[in-house]
Amino acid sequence: MVVLKWTNKYSGETGYVASVSTKVQCFVNTFNMDDAKRYSEKAVKGILTKLDNYHETDNNIFEMIEA
């Protein structure tokens, strides 16, 4: 299982994805890796596509981290 770490391209702030809201089309962040949602590596591709479609990748870089 992996978690998604995000880094803001402009501020350098970092954290983890706690959830992805399809209703609001955004992600909810957490600064504690223990609170981050665990994903299978297979599921991450779809999550990253959603985040790109929600324009979250305009300001953030997402990377997989082993949980």
For each predicted feature, which ranges?
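Short aromatic-glycine-(Arg/Gly/Cys) micro-motifs in beta-strand/loop hairpins
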Residues: 1-32
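Short, mixed-charge low-complexity intrinsically disordered segments
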Residues: 33-67
